[in-house]
Amino acid sequence: SIDKINELKYTTSMANCRGCTNNCRLTINKFSGGRQYVSGNRCERGIGKEKNKDHIPNLYEYKYKRIFSYTPLTADKASRGKVGIPRVLNMFENYPFWYTFFTELKYEVVLSPTSTRKIYELGIESIPSESECYPAKLAHGHVTWLIRNGVKFIFYPCIPYERNEFPDAVNHYNCPIVTSYAENIKNNVDELNDPSITFRNPFLAFTSEEILANRLVEDCLLYTSPSPRDRSVS
């Protein structure tokens, strides 16, 4: 009624929402009778309808585990022995392929551990330049870790081109560091000069399965028969 409208009283105050880092400036109108109206908010958190959720999935963690959580063959099933793969650079996208490839060829895939300061310090003496990015510097430690853990065959390919995931993409070329950093490793990690250690870093591209398969045989797997090689690539 008109009387109730005339009797309506309200107070206005200002506050900052703490629901997220936006810190929205809120205008809070409190009316007689206990009701209130909030404006200035950009989402429901500012008016108390939605609370911060503590069960939102960590997609970075999910991707990391999804890419690297493969179980290698046991020694009795790995008839070709071990192959070491450093957990660096392009392996954060391509490891599932290489794991499957070498597992099909009956290798036990040995993956270097998660990057830590200790891993970094393992390879610090072989880093040739301070201007390299930190992920590239870590590669020295990962390769050194594989060597010091007795892995005699290390595979770290140079990948100029990735698989084209979008038909209308202008290009799918890796940065120069990812493209050729294994060459840097080969020429600066002195322990790779040990004749008992085989370090393979062929230049490969994911643009053609047929060319990729042929290059793998030509560059680093000459002793494998074509049939298991073709199957592992496909």
Language model features with spans:
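Short acidic, glycine/serine/threonine-rich loops at helix termini
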Residues: 28-31, 39-40, 95-97, 121-125, ...
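Cofactor-cradling patches in redox/metallo enzymes
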Residues: 87-90, 120-174, 178
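Short helix-loop-beta junction
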Residues: 99-109
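Conserved small/polar residues in nucleotide/adenosyl-binding loops
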Residues: 223-230
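Short connector loops at secondary-structure junctions
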Residues: 107-131, 202-207
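Phosphate/diphosphate-binding loops
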Residues: 1-30, 138-149, 153-167, 186-187
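Flexible inter-domain linker/hinge segments
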Residues: 1-80, 229
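Glycine-rich, acidic loop regions that bind phosphate or pyrophosphate groups
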Residues: 164-219
